[in-house]
């Protein structure tokens, strides 16, 4: 029977990040394929395609996009792997950012034809703040792509991280012949599409004269020159990888499965067991026998038939056991978690035990909030808070049918507690109308869809001009007396704090100039 340390040591928990359509969902499914978690890979190809394994919400199946973060666990070569699949659509939510807080490392998928794109930059920034290892998979090499050296240079320039090519592509598109593995000094030949089946590969050394016969003299010479050029660059540094300052780069084609298995094997070899987390009492030993976890995501109505609400927890230390009494630090209550579940998108499975590094979902009766800490009785430390990100888009929202006020309030509050939206109110006003703020505008569509389908409430939604929000730390006057510029408003959150919403950074100067005692703070909290 494995020891606690052995079980924890085989855990690998990582997030996959990318810009829309870079191939993230396809790569995720190929990982699951190798782990035996799915029998075949189903690629997302727009609205007519079958729904991908990691897309479970109805709106995701309709649109062929991921708008919530899925959690998937599978076994492979002795490792227990937890994948946090983040939305790839350009409009995403705070849920995406928070999911990255539960990961120990990240896989960054880049479209070989497009390079570094806007959402990649946003997600990378969150990973970089945590200094977690970031591995790069440059995808779609079976199509026409940009120069591979140019792509690596762009990653370094745009993202501020060094790169080291673990393998090197031989051509691209119709000329794509395979990749050269620099460490093993071998060539894996690309043999065309495999459509979800495990790929067969041929191997030949770089110095082998038969390489010229196989690739052609010109292509073989080009490969030898490029590999020699790479050899004159920086050395591989494992410590830099683990510090998040050097990204190992792999080339391949997720759609055809080429390069996916070698990438997964190298990724598992280079990553470490779950990392220790910081609490208000210092760093918590991941191998401690005492269970502890934090809530990073709340999702309501994953199963519409059950009207349930799940809190997703990242286990940070020790071993979780079903039906054992634990302690919810924020409320001071003891609780018994009798139906812990692991996920494969919307598919669930009750688990009897789980270890540090694992993600479990537990039924939430309304007790949990994002960032909460759960420990064994007698331990009262709290893990560092989960960031709150400033919303960039705002709408005034009210129910079309005033008789549905109760459902409206319940729905907006529950969806806000999940972190998909932030809700505010006009000071002194009731809850018949709220201001909704989001990070990405798609969340308005998701919010409207869920309110109608889960709470039976049709909404009246009016766009507002604000794109910034600041917390009022102090002021010399009553909020009603603040001198406002055009396109600014005083709001209140549900912790009764006052905030200023406004249009454009220039407004800060106006507001502070005309309100001498006004002190504004960034709403981001960690």
Tell me what each language-model feature is:
Residues 1-526:
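Structural and coupling elements of P-loop NTPases
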């Amino acid at each position: 029977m494995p020891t606690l340390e052995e079980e924890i040591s085989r855990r690998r928990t990582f997030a996959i990040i990318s810009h829309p359509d870079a191939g993230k969902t396809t790569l995720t499914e190929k990982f699951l394929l190798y782990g035996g978690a799915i029998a075949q890979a189903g690629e997302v190809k727009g609205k007519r395609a079958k729904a991908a394994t990691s897309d479970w919400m109805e709106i995701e199946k309709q649109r062929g996009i991921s708008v919530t973060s899925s959690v998937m666990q599978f076994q492979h070569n002795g490792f227990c792997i937890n994948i946090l699949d983040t939305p790839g659509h350009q409009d995403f939510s705070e849920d995406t950012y928070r999911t990255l807080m539960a990961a120990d490392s990240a896989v960054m998928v880049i479209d070989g034809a497009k390079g570094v794109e806007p959402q990649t930059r946003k997600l990378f920034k969150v990973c970089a703040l945590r200094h977690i290892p970031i591995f790069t998979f440059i995808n779609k090499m079976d199509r026409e792509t940009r120069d591979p050296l140019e792509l690596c240079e762009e990653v370094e320039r745009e993202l501020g991280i060094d790169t080291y090519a673990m393998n090197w592509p031989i051509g691209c598109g119709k000329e794509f012949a395979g990749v050269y593995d620099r460490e093993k000094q071998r060539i894996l030949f690309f043999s065309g599409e495999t459509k979800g089946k495990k790929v067969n590969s041929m191997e030949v050394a770089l110095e082998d004269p038969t390489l010229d016969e196989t690739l052609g003299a010109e292509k073989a010479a080009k490969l030898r020159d490029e590999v020699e050029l790479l050899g004159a660059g920086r050395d591989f540094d494992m410590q830099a990888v683990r510090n998040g300052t050097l990204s190992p780069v792999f080339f391949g084609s997720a759609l055809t499965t080429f390069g996916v298995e070698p990438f997964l094997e190298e990724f598992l070899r280079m990553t470490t067991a779950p990392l220790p987390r910081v609490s208000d009492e210092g760093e918590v030993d991941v191998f401690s026998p005492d269970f502890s976890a934090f809530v990073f995501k709340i999702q309501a109505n994953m199963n519409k038939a059950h009207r349930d609400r799940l809190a997703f927890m990242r286990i940070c230390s020790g071993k979780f056991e079903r039906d054992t009494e634990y302690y919810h630090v924020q409320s001071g209550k003891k609780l018994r978690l009798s139906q812990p579940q692991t996920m494969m998108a919307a598919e669930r499975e009750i688990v009897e035990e789980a270890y540090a590094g694992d993600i479990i979902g537990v039924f939430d009766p309304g007790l949990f909030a994002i960032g909460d800490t759960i420990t064994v009785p007698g331990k009262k430390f709290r893990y560092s808070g989960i960031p709150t990100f400033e919303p960039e888009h705002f709408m005034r929202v009210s129910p079309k049918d005033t008789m549905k006020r109760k459902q409206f309030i319940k729905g907006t509050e529950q969806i806000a507690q999940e972190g998909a939206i932030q809700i505010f109110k006009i000071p002194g006003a009731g809850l018949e109308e709220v201001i909704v703020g989001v990070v990405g505008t798609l969340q308005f569509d998701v919010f409207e869809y869920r309110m109608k389908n889960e709470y039976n409430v049709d909404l009246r939604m009016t766009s507002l001009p604000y794109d910034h929000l600041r917390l009022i730390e102090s002021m010399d006057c009553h909020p009603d007396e603040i001198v406002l510029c055009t396109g600014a408003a005083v709001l209140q959150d549900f912790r009764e704090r006052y905030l200023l919403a406004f249009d454009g950074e220039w407004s800060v100067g106006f507001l502070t100039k005309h309100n001498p005692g006004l002190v504004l703070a960034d709403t981001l909290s960690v």
